[in-house]
C-alpha cells in the first residue's frame, strides 16, 4: 500500500502564535491586539475541537449578523474539507456534524438580545471582535457556558482589535492586570446552603498577535503591511502595533499619561500630587448613580484658571460599569466623610456642581434635597448639561500650550479617571458626541465642573514634542512615494 496516497490532507495548520492561543488551558482567553494575526481563523478552528462528541454544542458570536458572513465563509472553507459529511443549515445558522455535534453562529446587536440565549447551554463560546460587545453581554454569556453532557470541556475564547464600545472593559479585564501570556487568576467566595464558605478560582489570559505573527499573510499579500503603516496614527498604533492606548474612534486623542513628566508637569495630563495653596478655589463635581457607578471629583483651580483633579470617589463594585446600589443619603455620607478626613479639603469652602437630574421633584423629594439634609449638608448647584459644549471644553483644556502645559491635569491617584477617560469612543448615531453606553460617569461629572469654568478655544493646537530618538533614526528616515 502506498502510504502517500492515503495520507490525510492537512486542512489548516496553526502558526506559532495561533498555536499558543489554542493550547491555553484557562477558561477564558483573548487573542489579538493588532490586525492580520489570524485571529478569526483560530477562533473558527477552535470550535471544532470537540465535534466528535455527539452532545457537543458551540456558539460563535459577532455583534451583528451581517458581520458573521466572513466567519461563515471561513467555516465553509474549513469545515466542509475537514468533515465532508457535515452540513450547514443557512436558515438556522448551524453546522450539523456526523456525530450529532452542532456549531451555531449567532449575533447580539442589542443588549436585550442576550435573552435569545436564555436557557441555552454551550460547551464552547467564541466572541469575534470582543470590543464590539458590552460587559453585560459578555458576562451574561458566561452563564450560558456550561456542559451539555458528560466529557466536554467548557471554556470561552475571544478575538479582537483595540477600539469599540467595549474597549475599556476588555482592556481592564485582559490587558491591564498582567503581562501578555500571564494567567490572571481571580478568587471568589461562594456561600453554600449549609452556611459554609467555599473559595473558588477562575483564570483568564491575553495572547497578543500581530501581522508579524502571520508569515503566511505577509507572503501572500506583501502590500498589507504597507497599508497598515499608511493609516492615520491612531489606527496605525492600534492595528499595526496592537496599542491599547490609541485606537480608531477614540474621543480624546489628546490624552497623554507620561510618568517621566509627572514631576515637571509638561506634556502629560497625569501628574504627581502636590500641596494645594489655601487660596485656590475647590470644586466638587457629582454624577449620581445607583445600578451604575456614582462619581465624585474634587478640583482645585489655580490663578491661571487651570484645573487639577486632586481627589475622586467612585462608587463601583470593581466590575465594569457596575454601581454599589446605595441610596443618595449614604452617598452623601461617604462624600462628607471623604472631605472631613482629607487635610486638603477639611474646612475648605467647596463649590458643588452636579447633574441637573438630581433636582427632579416629579417623583417626590429630589436627590439633591436628600443629600442636603442633616447631618451631611451637601449643597449642589445644577450643572450645565449642554453635551457638545461640555465636550469641547474637554478638548480646549486637554490641549497643550507651547510650554507643554494643558489647562486640565489629574493627580496620578485618580485611577478611575485615568482608566475611563481615554477609553471613551464616539456614538455611531450621534457622531459628534460620545457613546453614553460606556462608563462615562467621571466624564459627565468633570464636564459639569468644566462648564462652570469655561475657557476660550486655544489660539492653535500645539503638536507634541518629537519622541526620543537617541540613534537619530527618525530624522534619517526616508519616505518614498510609489
What residues fall within each predicted segment?
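Conserved RecA-like ASCE P-loop NTPase motor core of nucleic-acid helicases/translocases
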Residues: 56-68
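Mg2+-dependent endonuclease catalytic cores in nucleic-acid-processing enzymes, primarily RNase H-like
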Residues: 297, 305-438, 454-482
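ATPase catalytic-site recognition across NTP-hydrolyzing enzymes
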Residues: 213-286
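Pre-P-loop entry segment of helicase/translocase ATPase cores
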Residues: 1-27
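ASCE P-loop NTPase helicase motor core
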Residues: 132-214
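Walker B catalytic acidic pair
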Residues: 128-129
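Inter-Walker segment of RecA-like/P-loop motor cores
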Residues: 66-123
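Walker A/P-loop NTP-binding motif
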Residues: 40-54
Amino acid at each position: 500500500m502506498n502510504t502517500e496516497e492515503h495520507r490525510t490532507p492537512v486542512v489548516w495548520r496553526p502558526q506559532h502564535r495561533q498555536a499558543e492561543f489554542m493550547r491555553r488551558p484557562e477558561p477564558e482567553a483573548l487573542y489579538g491586539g493588532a490586525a492580520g494575526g489570524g485571529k478569526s481563523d483560530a477562533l473558527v478552528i477552535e470550535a471544532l475541537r470537540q465535534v466528535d462528541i455527539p452532545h457537543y454544542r458551540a456558539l460563535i458570536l459577532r455583534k451583528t449578523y451581517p458581520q458573521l458572513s466572513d466567519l461563515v465563509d471561513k467555516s465553509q472553507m474549513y469545515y466542509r474539507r475537514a468533515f465532508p459529511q457535515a452540513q450547514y443549515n443557512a436558515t438556522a445558522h448551524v453546522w450539523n456534524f456526523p456525530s450529532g455535534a452542532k456549531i451555531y453562529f449567532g449575533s447580539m446587536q442589542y443588549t436585550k438580545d442576550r435573552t435569545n440565549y436564555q436557557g441555552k447551554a454551550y460547551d464552547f463560546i467564541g466572541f469575534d471582535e470582543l470590543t464590539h460587545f458590552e460587559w453585560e453581554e459578555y458576562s451574561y454569556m458566561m452563564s450560558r457556558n456550561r456542559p451539555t453532557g458528560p466529557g466536554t470541556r467548557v471554556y470561552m475564547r475571544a478575538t479582537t482589535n483595540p477600539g469599540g464600545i467595549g474597549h475599556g472593559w476588555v482592556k481592564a479585564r485582559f490587558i491591564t492586570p498582567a503581562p501578555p501570556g500571564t494567567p490572571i487568576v481571580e478568587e471568589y467566595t461562594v456561600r453554600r446552603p449549609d452556611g459554609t464558605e467555599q473559595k473558588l478560582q477562575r483564570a483568564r489570559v491575553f495572547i497578543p498577535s500581530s501581522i508579524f505573527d502571520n508569515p503566511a499573510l505577509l507572503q501572500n499579500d506583501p502590500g498589507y503591511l504597507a497599508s497598515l503603516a499608511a493609516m492615520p496614527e491612531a489606527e496605525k498604533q492600534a492595528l499595526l502595533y496592537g496599542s491599547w492606548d490609541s485606537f480608531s474612534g477614540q474621543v480624546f486623542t489628546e490624552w497623554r499619561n507620561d510618568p517621566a513628566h509627572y514631576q515637571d508637569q509638561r506634556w502629560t495630563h497625569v501628574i504627581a500630587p502636590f500641596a494645594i495653596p489655601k487660596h485656590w478655589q475647590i470644586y466638587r463635581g457629582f454624577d449620581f448613580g445607583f445600578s451604575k457607578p456614582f462619581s465624585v471629583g474634587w478640583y482645585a483651580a489655580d490663578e491661571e484658571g487651570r484645573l487639577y483633579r486632586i481627589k475622586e470617589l467612585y462608587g463601583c463594585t470593581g466590575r465594569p460599569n457596575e454601581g454599589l446600589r446605595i441610596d443618595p443619603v449614604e452617598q452623601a455620607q461617604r462624600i462628607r466623610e471623604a472631605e472631613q478626613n482629607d487635610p486638603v479639603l477639611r474646612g475648605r469652602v467647596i463649590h458643588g456642581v452636579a447633574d441637573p437630574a438630581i433636582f427632579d421633584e416629579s417623583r417626590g423629594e429630589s436627590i439633591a434635597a436628600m443629600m442636603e439634609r442633616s447631618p451631611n449638608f451637601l449643597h449642589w448647584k445644577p450643572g450645565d448639561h449642554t453635551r457638545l459644549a461640555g465636550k469641547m471644553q474637554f478638548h480646549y483644556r486637554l490641549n497643550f500650550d507651547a510650554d507643554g502645559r494643558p489647562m486640565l491635569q489629574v493627580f496620578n491617584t485618580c485611577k478611575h479617571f485615568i482608566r475611563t477617560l481615554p477609553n471613551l469612543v464616539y456614538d455611531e448615531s450621534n457622531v459628534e458626541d460620545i457613546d453614553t453606553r460606556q462608563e462615562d460617569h467621571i466624564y459627565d461629572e468633570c464636564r459639569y465642573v468644566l462648564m462652570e469654568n469655561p475657557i476660550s478655544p486655544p489660539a492653535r493646537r500645539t503638536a507634541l514634542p518629537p519622541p526620543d530618538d537617541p540613534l537619530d533614526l527618525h530624522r534619517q528616515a526616508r519616505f518614498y512615494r510609489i
